[in-house]
Amino acid sequence: MKMPGILLYGFGPYDSHETNISGELVRSIQLPRNVSREVFDVKFDRAMFIDAIRRHGPAIIIGLGQSARSRKIRIERRAVNLMGERGKKKRPISRHGPDHLSMSLDVPHDDQARLSYDAGTYVCNFSMYVIAEHCRDSRRRCGFIHLPKRYDMRHAEAFVGKLVEQTLLSRNHWV
């Protein structure tokens, strides 16, 4: 068995946010060589996410996003089949897809983090749904974490670094 490759992704700035902690963390965190990185533009673009999976060929995909209102790390457990910007009409991500898809990667939580079953309907949720739908008939695992906008970068790096390390050490994710 070989150790799994991981794709860690985050996002660049959006709307009035000049920075995005998720993209900053993906760029700055020290990671093993079998972890690929992507920082995506904040846009509803299915092909952008699928192309990255095809390019990197990971067994595990960990997404990071920024939460402007949260004070704790949120471990997202499901993506809903809705997309849209705040104040605009929502529409389905996948015309014939299920109402929601569960994340297949178990992410441990502690006092720094809480479980969440509502990732909203913006691009983080969109990426989660598209990736989970793409991976559901494969052995790939995917998970998503929202980081508070004003969270301490050292603590965020420690949390994500520990998650990557635990994921790599867990035989449940080896292919």
List PLM regions with ranges.
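N-terminal catalytic or cofactor-binding beta/alpha core of small enzyme domains
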Residues: 1-121, 131-142, 148, 154-175
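Short glycine/serine/threonine-rich phosphate/pyrophosphate-binding segments
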Residues: 124
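Active-site-adjacent betaalpha module
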Residues: 127-128
